[in-house]
Amino acid sequence: MKYGIGYLLGLGALALQPLAHGADLQLKSSLTANRVIPADYYWNQFGCSGANLAPRLDWQNAPAGTKSFAITFYDQDAPTGSGFWHRVVYDIPANVHSLPGGKDGGPLPEGAIESNTDLGKPGFFGPCPPEGRQHRYKWTVHALNVAKLPVKPDYSAALTGFFLWQHTLAKSELVLLAGPRKESTQ
């Protein structure tokens, strides 16, 4: 026998490892994953006329060692070659497990920091896909191993994302669809 009992037991332990750690981090929303976002959630610029609403977000099953959370909202299909960041929030305290959503993103918990988006300023802006195209928009919750992310609010979304990935223990994603918007007749 080429492999010994110890080797096989080790493989069995690896297979059961996820069970020993409990359930994975889960992100849920008031909107349904992989479904089209209602138009009233759209931004109110660039040809869109929505109310700029964010959905409620809830997360659970953070891994041991989680010291804070971050939430991002990203258009992975934006015609930029690198997507488009619609919201970046970090330093969400570890005892917070939801954001209520609402107009302009809704309120944030005390201590949370809203970083620059790809508009070059902090805040939230809802989806606004180009006319005639459907885009995939991704909400992500990151469980972080630091209470305070070592970034400044004026960092670009991409640079903040770089630091997020360095400190992410686990993440959960929720993809929503927006569009296609009808072409204007003007």
Residue ranges, per PLM feature:
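N-terminus-centered regions that define maturation/targeting leaders and the start
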Residues: H21-Q186
